């Protein structure tokens, strides 16, 4: 594992602490079907049944999925558990940062990166509008 892959795993650990990451088949399935998942990550040594279930989750909720260059053990160790074959990022900025942290994947999946960039811009715009609204309410402007 090189340094960029290690940084990407550390970003996943940070997303877990921020509660922006679902780990395991059932929580990922719930996040995908409810539309909360922004990116589904599958370990490259996951079983065929796991791949089939992940694809069906993505068809139901429309998030993109990626086969990451980590084994189940590497992915699990980065997240603080024994093994993890499937995890879902539920925050667009984290998903975009993770994909940008792995340049070999980002080059292959430009369309996913563009969609995550668009979603991140929408999130940032909503935060700015909310901040302006709170300021206007505080100072009595309408």
Question: Where do the PLM segments sit?
Answer:
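Long, amphipathic alpha-helical "stalk/connector" segments that mediate intersubunit docking
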Residues: 2, 6-7, 11, 141
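N-terminal first-folded block
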Residues: 7-39
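Compact, Lys/Arg-rich rRNA/RNP-binding cores from ribosome-related proteins
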Residues: 26-91, 95
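Helix-rich interaction surfaces within compact, conserved domain-sized segments
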Residues: 76-126
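Intrinsically disordered, Lys/Arg-rich low-complexity segments
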Residues: 122-142
């Amino acid at each position: 594992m090189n340094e960029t892959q290690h940084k990407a795993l550390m970003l996943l650990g940070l997303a877990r602490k921020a509660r922006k990451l679902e780990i395991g088949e059932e929580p990922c399935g719930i996040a995908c079907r409810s539309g909360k998942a922004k990116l589904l990550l599958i370990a490259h040594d996951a079983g065929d049944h796991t791949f089939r279930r992940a694809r069906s989750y993505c068809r139901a909720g429309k998030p993109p999925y990626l086969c990451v260059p980590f084994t189940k053990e590497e992915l699990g160790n980065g997240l603080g558990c024994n093994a993890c074959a499937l995890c879902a990022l539920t925050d667009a900025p984290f998903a975009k940062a993770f994909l940008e942290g792995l340049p070999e994947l980002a080059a292959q999946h430009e369309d996913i990166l563009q969609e995550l960039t668009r979603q991140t811009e929408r999130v940032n715009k909503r935060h700015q509008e909310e901040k302006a609204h709170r300021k206007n309410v505080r100072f009595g402007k309408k």
